[in-house]
């Protein structure tokens, strides 16, 4: 169990460092003002229009770094700062979220797969740890029947969450690539602004990478606990 706490602690530390770096980057690039004077909302609306998407709304949502695309009601939700500000960070985030809208409109396969997993993972992710732990208490590690099968069921649930986190990676990287390509090809940003947008999105993507690695490490650890004691 101590190994688990050390592992989780290390992953939590790395996650905190990456998140802190991300916030620092966004604060820095928030000071790089766009030469075209467009706000994040205007950037988003133009990118959607340039891709022939007219059934998606751009709305403001409270908080910092709360930006997301909602495929259910087709809305690009931009945090208050991103929605109204006119800088490289806002342009990067707005274009990235619109990248998800473009994925949705073009039936991007990885986004489709992730969307199908959402309702399942939203339920199983909160239960998996308890199911595995319950199975271990019932003797899974010693190879006892009922406890073992309960623990395996928990591992499967945990595995779905891990799968979801890894499917998220190509979705996020592709959205960033679409955003950066559009910003560059449409001359929406200067070279300096483009570099800032690229750097900001790079650090945003790393938060998903750390989360995926953490999920896999947790799955492997508990898998060893369940299967390690069996002959």
Specify the residue positions occupied by each region the protein language model found.
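Hydrophobic alpha-helical transmembrane segments of polytopic
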Residues: 7-11, 121-128, 150-157, 161, ...
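Helix-coil boundary and interhelical linker segments in multi-pass alpha-helical membrane proteins
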Residues: 1-4, 137-152, 227-231
């Amino acid at each position: 169990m101590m190994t688990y706490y050390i592992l989780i602690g290390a992953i939590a530390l790395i996650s905190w460092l990456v998140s802190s770096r991300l916030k620092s980057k966004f604060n820095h690039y928030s000071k790089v003002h766009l030469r075209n004077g467009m706000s994040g909302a205007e950037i988003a609306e133009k990118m959607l229009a340039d891709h022939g998407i007219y059934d998606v709304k751009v709305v403001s949502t409270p908080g910092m770094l709360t930006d997301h695309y909602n495929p259910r009601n087709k809305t690009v939700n931009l945090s208050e700062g991103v929605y109204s500000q006119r800088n490289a960070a806002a342009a990067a985030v707005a274009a990235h979220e619109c990248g998800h809208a473009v994925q949705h409109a073009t039936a991007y396969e990885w986004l489709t797969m992730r969307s199908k997993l959402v309702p399942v993972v939203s339920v199983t992710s909160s239960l998996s740890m308890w199911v595995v732990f319950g199975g271990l208490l019932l003797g899974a590690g010693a190879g006892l029947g009922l406890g073992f099968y309960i623990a395996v069921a928990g591992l499967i649930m945990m595995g779905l969450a891990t799968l979801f986190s890894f499917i998220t990676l190509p979705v996020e990287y592709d959205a960033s690539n679409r955003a950066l390509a559009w910003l560059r090809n449409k001359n929406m940003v200067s070279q300096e602004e483009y570099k800032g947008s690229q750097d900001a999105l790079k650090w945003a993507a790393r938060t998903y990478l750390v989360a995926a690695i953490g999920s896999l490490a947790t799955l492997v650890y508990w898998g060893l606990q369940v299967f390690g004691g069996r002959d």
